């Protein structure tokens, strides 16, 4: 394992030879084995590795959120500003969580309470840790939503999680995590479920807020594109162990461990590869399809004006036999609607979908059934 680059600042967090044990009969003894690293103020340390490598369990151990008794801490130290959190009382850990160390989870829809308004959830975090009047808490909540660049903060305060987009829910989670200006922010794959445009915005936001609040960020991910964007240092985990750690430049551009080298080689390149020519023999042709979603209008046209969303507007694509066609775009661009129209889960407003010379738009359910099976 390469040596860890020392930080000029005194570490906020020091993980020293941490061991987290798995239940008997598991494939390996430890979920986390002999893990050591530090995190300094204003530093972003990215922890990367495939699923099951121990990234998230290390973070949960820091927060005192291991799924005990089946998965439990065995030995090692977790030093937060010199205090060993493995020896902290449950009451002390509750003070640390949210107040001094906060966490952003991968899927805010499961982390947020679905039956509580966003404002009430932020208020709950503030009320638990500090003494402020209701008006002061409300002003702080509004300020936090402004900081994470959510539109119309008063409306967001009154909204339920399901009424927000995925990116808005993640921003609300970040607002909650930063409510008490924690010294450490743990981000557990917070952009995985987001489209690339929203992901880029969230990464910029985390960097801006980190600099503003002098926060150390422990960023857990499997995406080397994210690592290249934000990391100061990188720790690579495999089978519960750190196999390589160093500056982002050294790990990404000059990896020394075979596993890290394999991970970096697996990152798709934007340089076009030499590909086998594909004959111009379309197996599928989508010709000028239109699909519009309509909502509103109320009963007998007495409600709000009808709204129209043009999900697919004159879309034309073709797919040759033996060819792979990639369709990309941000959330709401019409990718999934196009796919659903092709398999006739949605009816198009106009256009043709021709498969092997047959227009699928003219087939009934019985005619489509053998094509779907």
Give the ranges of each region predicted by the language model.
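Conserved structural motif at the start of ABC-family nucleotide-binding domains
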Residues: 13, 32, 96, 284, ...
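Helix-to-loop junction immediately C-terminal to a conserved catalytic motif
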Residues: 63, 343
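ABC ATPase NBD coupling module
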Residues: 71-72, 85-102, 128, 250-255, ...
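Conserved ABC transporter NBD signature motif
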Residues: 72-84, 351-359
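A short, proline-enriched helix->beta-strand linker immediately N-terminal to the Walker B motif
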Residues: 179-183
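Short, glycine/charged-rich "phosphate-handling" switch motifs in NTP-dependent
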Residues: 233, 245
